[in-house]
Amino acid sequence: MRILYIHGLDSRPNPERISSLESNGHQVFALHLDYRTEPSSYLKLKQYAKGEQVEFIVGSSLGGLMGFWLGEELGLPCLLFNPAVYFGRENANIQLENRIGCPRRWVVIGEKDEVVDPQISYQYFEDIAPQSQAQRVIRCQWLGHQIDPDTFREVQRWVGL
């Protein structure tokens, strides 16, 4: 499967996560973005996803917010870790051309997240798709903002990646 991995704010693509996905036979694409100086990051990701014919999105924090909207706009399934939904579409300069809708979404929320308020994230996803079969929200009591390798691999396995 062709996967786009999107890192968070002030971060970079995580080689361990990319390697974990690749070890299962996936082709992983990842851009290093400086969201603070590149206001067109979303557009760049969208063009890249289309050009590489991406089939699945994995995103973390601000990358999770970008991944959420890419999934909605391009009709791609996604796995989102602590998506920074509080940041908002407008603040991230996300312009939608159309909205096909995400066919399948997994959202992992760390209950000990010290950066992204887990309750705001949980409520956001409950409000947009209450009891939807197309969305699974996983609340991890032990998880902070950083995703440890064991949790990443376990969720990856659970999702089927």
Locate each region found by the language model.
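Active-site nucleophile loop of the alpha/beta-hydrolase fold
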Residues: 8, 31-34, 76-88, 110-112
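Conserved alpha/beta-hydrolase fold motif
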Residues: 56-58, 78
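Short beta-strand/loop motif that positions the catalytic acidic residue
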Residues: 101-102, 106-109, 113
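Acidic catalytic loop of the alpha/beta-hydrolase fold
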Residues: 11-12, 111-117, 145-146
